[in-house]
Regions:
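Short catalytic/metal-binding and nucleic-acid-binding patches
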Residues: 1-149
């Protein structure tokens, strides 16, 4: 059977998109089903990296939830100074080196166009561990950071 080649979409942000637009981002580990993200030490390192990139002015993380083999986040990128793909490439590279996380090559992003879409994706993200059968209530999942808005 031939290898399946997944179509790769460009991650460039058009110049007509306002800086500060919020994106739904999903980043997967290369090996699905293996817990690479939700150990105490790795989750702390990942959240610290999110905070560090925010302190550098590269992004503003509204919400990030770690699952065992992927993460979901709602992020506003500083696209005036950095490209979205370069920020995520750097973030993934740092965590691959420091925490030996084996990421998939690419990532998924979708720009959220209004507050209703933002809240819908936030709820989707918060309920992910419930849908996966990892907890009964979303509030029981410890691998979540959420900014005060």
């Amino acid at each position: 059977m031939p290898d399946f080649e997944r179509k790769q979409l460009p991650h460039g942000v058009p110049n007509w998109v306002a800086d500060g637009a919020v994106y739904f981002v999903a980043i997967n580990c290369r090996i699905r089903g293996e817990d690479q993200l939700t150990t105490k030490s790795k989750s702390e390192a990942i959240f610290e990296a999110f905070r560090h990139y925010e302190s550098l002015g590269k992004w503003h993380v509204r919400l990030c939830l770690l699952m065992p083999d992927h993460l979901h986040a709602l992020i506003s990128f500083n696209t005036r100074e950095y490209s979205m793909s370069s920020i995520i490439r750097s973030f993934k590279g740092y965590l691959a080196k420091e925490q030996q996380i084996d990421w998939q090559k690419n990532y998924f992003d979708h720009r959220l166009r209004n507050d209703a879409a933002l809240e819908e994706k936030a709820q989707y993200i918060r309920l992910n561990p419930v849908r996966a059968g990892l907890v009964e209530q979303a509030t029981e999942w410890p691998y979540l950071i959420e900014a005060e808005v």
